[in-house]
């Protein structure tokens, strides 16, 4: 019992001594740095220890847990690599293949062929002949198509008739050249105005005109027969063609009357002749004849055209040769092939799906492309290379056609054959290609671009990618060499502290020690993380001796026994408390545990410092590289072809189509205008014709009368519409109104003053103006007038005698006036028109004779 109490007594004395020493030290150091309130308090005892809670503090845990890594012998053995082999750097997974490439582009040039145009040009000249000079007033021209029978005559004899017969509105009109009224043939000669793409042959080079008689107008007629051999062009898909003078024909040049080619004109005006013979050239007599297998004729009101009809497949080709590349590298990406040519400085992208060689559009270029590939191979590769495959066709994203012939060196092929023989396998060496084509490569021929800028851009990108990947390969190789050198450094440092080096390398806590030339590894034993506590005081019981690292209290898992150790690096707990040093004053030490650091001043804990507030020494040089992956550039089109066409206000094709349509419409309207027979007369004539001969005769009579009446009415209407006629009618109406006004005034005057009107020769009495009488005199005169107002009444006989006397008097006065007029007229002294007009109301007016005339 006494043996048990003695150790307890010694432990109690030690605890009291440590408490007193810590209190005195805390008081001494408090003069420099303030301490926390818990340092001056007495806490409860820690279980299974003689320490109290105020003498320790808890620490946190971060990446590495608190563990004990001291061991006697490890279970795993490791060694450092002696030689490190650096593998070759391959940025992307690409398979390269060498070959020959021939590129064809879409032929945008139109199909060109010859067209013969037959026309008769009527020129009407009008002139006026004066006394000494003739004046040309102008001319007009009219283009007419040569009849079909006359076209055959021209193609046989190189001659054309000088007359034109037309039927307009049921009437026949005939025009002769030079108004000769003789129908004869004329020789076709070459015109002086032919050019490189057109040749014209005419019958008249100079126009003729004969002036008329003096003060007369004259109109002359010239009939010129013209045959034009010109070129026409038709663009894919060959639905119409355009002649060099701008005439648009909405017919496919390959339409033969029975195939499915486009035809948009009047079918009644189109005909086809097989084995048609015609002269080889115009302008000469006795020209040789040439047979044409199939000739098409199309007639318009102003021209008749003919051209040779041929097969489209034998005379047109949708593609034409563009470029060839003798040295081409093909690389395979996920969905596409890249054809890179350094001579063309371009890279072309195609899908992995091959084109169908039996397509009719490729028949015209397939044989030529194969011959060209074989020629290049025989001249450049035949000695050292062999063909490693057949010719294949691909379409690029820009609409180009690529013919590809893969080649391979003979030495490489021999090595492959040896490898195949060694492995005793019959597997094909041909690489399996994906049949899934890229969605962007399925373009129709109407959507492709007409530019290859995208190919040059793709080549630029691939070139840069190769340069960058080469640089990355060099960096990777240099990095590998640096790792070899770093390994040697780690191996030498591991001899000093193997556990620290191995923990840093494997990024986890490891216990390591050298056992000869190898390293023995053991797993660290983790302790109860919540039981880890650090003493605040780093001083020992011996004077002048302090711990070199803080003392730690901990317990193992599933154990309550408290162990003592010292805090190592990265939360490692070092077994034992034998790591001491001589105390140094003043002293400042900071120890890292978890995510925090703990500051000890003069070997006493002062405060906790956040780890983020302490700067780190960054020796890491990061290397973050990624290889450039494949990127397929797409051929972008800012505006489509239709948008570019519609953005221009002038569209030549539409303008010419509209112009030709307008011309045909005007000719049709002209025929309707000249048809002057009214519809009702046509209906009446049809009705009368159905009644037999009598009805037809009656209809002719009615039509003649109706035509005469209609002609008279049209003449009157035409006269009124004429400016001179309208002015004449207005003057006539004014004259009629004037006559009516004079008659009205005469009748009014006769009604108001009949005596003066019927007896103008009776002179009325002269009125004498006197002063008015006085009142008495006026009364007297009134009495006298009343007395004399009683008049005598006359009988009917007397009235009759008076009328006879008046008649006799009137006759005498009129005879006397006529006699006087005759006398004055004989003497040259008649009254003028103005005098008679001025004195028309005064009957019997005569000019007074002077004394000399008497």
UniProtKB/Swiss-Prot annotation:
Signal peptide bounds: 1-30
Residue intervals annotated with topology Intravirion: 745-854
Region span, Involved in fusion and/or binding to host membrane: 127-133, 212-219
Tagged with keyword Membrane: yes
Annotated spans, Hydrophobic membrane proximal region: 669-721, 700-720
Topological type in the membrane: Single-pass type I membrane protein
Disulfide links within the chain: 69-524, 86-480, 160-225, 317-364, 546-583
Side of membrane Virion surface, spans: 31-723
Primary localization class, coarse: virion
InterPro entries in the cross-refs: Glycoprot_B_PH1, Glycoprot_B_PH2, Glycoprot_B_PH2_sf, Glycoprotein_B_ecto_C, Herpes_Glycoprot_B
Pfam families, per the entry: Glycoprot_B_PH1, Glycoprot_B_PH2, Glycoprotein_B
Post-translational modification: A proteolytic cleavage by host furin generates two subunits that remain linked by disulfide bonds.
GO biological process: symbiont entry into host cell; virion attachment to host cell
Keywords: Disulfide bond, Glycoprotein, Host cell membrane, Host endosome, Host Golgi apparatus, Host membrane, Host-virus interaction, Membrane, Signal, Transmembrane, Transmembrane helix, Viral attachment to host cell, Viral envelope protein, Virion, Virus entry into host cell
Gene3D superfamilies reported in the protein's UniProt record: 1.20.5.1890, 2.30.29.100, 2.30.30.1230, 6.10.250.3280
Positions of transmembrane segments: 724-744
Site annotation Cleavage: residues: 433-434
UniProt-annotated location(s): Virion membrane; Host cell membrane; Host endosome membrane; Host Golgi apparatus membrane
Biological role stated in the UniProt entry: Envelope glycoprotein that forms spikes at the surface of virion envelope. Essential for the initial attachment to heparan sulfate moieties of the host cell surface proteoglycans. Involved in fusion of viral and cellular membranes leading to virus entry into the host cell. Following initial binding to its host receptors, membrane fusion is mediated by the fusion machinery composed at least of gB and the heterodimer gH/gL. May be involved in the fusion between the virion envelope and the outer nuclear membrane during virion egress.
Family of this protein: Belongs to the herpesviridae glycoprotein B family.
HAMAP family recorded: HSV_GB (MF_04032)
Subunit field text: Homotrimer; disulfide-linked. Binds to heparan sulfate proteoglycans. Interacts with gH/gL heterodimer.
Name listed for the protein in its UniProt record: Envelope glycoprotein B
Protein species of origin: Rhesus cytomegalovirus (strain 68-1) (RhCMV)
Lineage: Viruses, Duplodnaviria, Heunggongvirae, Peploviricota, Herviviricetes
């Amino acid at each position: 019992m006494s043996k048990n109490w003695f150790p307890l007594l010694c432990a109690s004395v030690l605890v009291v001594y440590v408490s007193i020493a810590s209190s005195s030290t805390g008081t001494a150091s408090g003069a420099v740095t303030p301490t926390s309130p818990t340092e001056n308090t007495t806490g409860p005892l820690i279980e299974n220890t003689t320490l109290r809670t105020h003498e320790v503090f808890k620490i946190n845990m971060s990446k590495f847990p608190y563990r004990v890594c001291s061991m006697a012998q490890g279970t795993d053995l490791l060694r450092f690599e002696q030689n490190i082999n650096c593998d070759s750097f391959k940025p992307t997974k690409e398979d390269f293949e060498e070959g020959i490439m021939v590129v064809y582009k879409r032929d945008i040039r139109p199909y060109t062929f010859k067209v013969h145009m037959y026309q008769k040009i009527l020129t009407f000249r009008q002139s006026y002949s004066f006394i000494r000079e003739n004046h040309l007033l102008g001319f007009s021209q009219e283009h007419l198509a040569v009849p079909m029978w006359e076209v055959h005559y021209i193609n046989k004899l190189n001659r054309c008739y000088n007359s034109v017969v037309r039927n307009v509105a049921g009437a026949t009109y005939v025009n002769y050249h030079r108004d000769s009224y003789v129908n004869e043939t004329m020789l076709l000669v070459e015109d002086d105005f032919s050019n490189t793409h057109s040749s014209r042959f005419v019958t008249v080079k100079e126009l003729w005109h004969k002036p008329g008689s003096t003060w007369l107008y004259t109109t002359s007629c010239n009939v010129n027969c013209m045959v034009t051999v010109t070129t026409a062009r038709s663009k894919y898909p060959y639905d119409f063609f355009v002649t060099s003078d701008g005439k648009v024909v909405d017919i496919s040049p390959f339409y033969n009357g029975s195939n499915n080619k486009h035809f948009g004109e009047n079918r009644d005006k189109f005909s086809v002749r097989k084995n048609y013979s015609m002269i080889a050239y115009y302008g000469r007599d006795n020209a040789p004849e040439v047979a044409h297998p199939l000739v098409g004729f199309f007639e318009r009101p102003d021209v008749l055209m003919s051209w040779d009809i041929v097969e489209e497949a034998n005379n047109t080709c949708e593609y034409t040769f563009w470029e060839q590349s003798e040295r081409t590298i093909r690389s395979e990406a996920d969905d596409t092939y890249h054809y890179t040519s350094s001579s063309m400085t371009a890279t072309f992208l195609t899908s992995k799906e091959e084109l169908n060689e039996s397509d009719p559009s490729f028949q015209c270029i397939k044989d030529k492309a194969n011959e060209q590939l074989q020629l290049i191979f025989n001249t450049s590769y035949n000695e050292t290379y062999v063909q490693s495959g057949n010719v294949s066709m691909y379409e690029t994203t820009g609409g180009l056609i690529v013919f590809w012939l893969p080649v391979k060196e003979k030495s490489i092929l021999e090595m492959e054959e040896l490898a195949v023989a060694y492995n005793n396998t019959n597997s094909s060496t041909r690489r399996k290609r994906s049949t899934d084509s890229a969605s962007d490569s399925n373009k129709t021929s109407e959507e492709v671009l007409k530019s290859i800028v995208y190919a040059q851009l793709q080549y630029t990108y691939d070139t840069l990618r190769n340069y960058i990947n080469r640089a990355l390969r060099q960096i990777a190789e240099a990095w590998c060499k640096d790792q070899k050198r770093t390994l040697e450094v780690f191996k030498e440092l591991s001899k000093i502290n193997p556990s620290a080096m191995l923990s840093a390398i494997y990024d986890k806590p490891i216990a390591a020690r050298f056992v000869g030339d190898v390293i023995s590894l053991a797993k660290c034993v983790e302790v109860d993380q919540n039981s880890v506590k650090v003493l605040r005081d780093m001083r020992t019981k011996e004077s002048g001796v302090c711990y070199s690292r803080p003392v730690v209290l901990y317990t193992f898992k599933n154990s309550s026994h408290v162990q003592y150790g010292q805090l190592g690096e990265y939360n490692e707990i070092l077994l034992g408390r034998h790591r001491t040093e001589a105390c140094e004053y003043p002293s400042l030490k900071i120890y890292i545990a978890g995510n925090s650091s703990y500051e000890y001043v003069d070997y006493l804990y002062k405060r906790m410092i956040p780890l983020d507030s302490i700067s780190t020494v960054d020796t890491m040089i990061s290397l973050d590289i990624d290889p450039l992956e494949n990127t397929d550039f797409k051929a972008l089109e800012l505006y489509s072809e239709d948008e570019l066409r519609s953005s221009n206000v002038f569209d030549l094709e539409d303008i010419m189509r509209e112009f030709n349509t307008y011309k045909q419409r005007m000719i049709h309207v002209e025929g309707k205008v000249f048809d002057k027979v009214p519809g009702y007369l046509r209906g009446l004539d049809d009705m009368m014709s159905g009644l037999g001969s009598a009805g037809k005769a009656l209809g002719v009579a009615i039509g003649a009368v109706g035509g005469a009446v209609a002609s008279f009415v049209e003449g009157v209407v035409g006269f009124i519409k004429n400016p001179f006629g309208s002015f004449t009618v207005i003057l006539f109406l004014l004259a009629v109104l004037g006559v009516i006004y004079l008659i009205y005034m005469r009748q009014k005057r006769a009604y108001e003053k009949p005596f003066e009107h019927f007896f103008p020769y009776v002179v009325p009495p002269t009125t004498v103006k006197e002063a008015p009488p006085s009142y008495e005199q006026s009364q007297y005169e009134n009495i006298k007038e009343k007395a004399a107002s009683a008049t005598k009444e006359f009988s009917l006989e007397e009235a009759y005698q008076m009328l006879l006397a008046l008649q006799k008097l009137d006759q005498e006065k009129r005879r006397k006036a006529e006699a006087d007029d005759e006398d004055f007229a004989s003497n040259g002294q008649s009254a003028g028109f103005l005098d008679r007009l001025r004195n028309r109301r005064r009957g019997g007016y005569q000019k007074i004779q002077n004394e000399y005339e008497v």
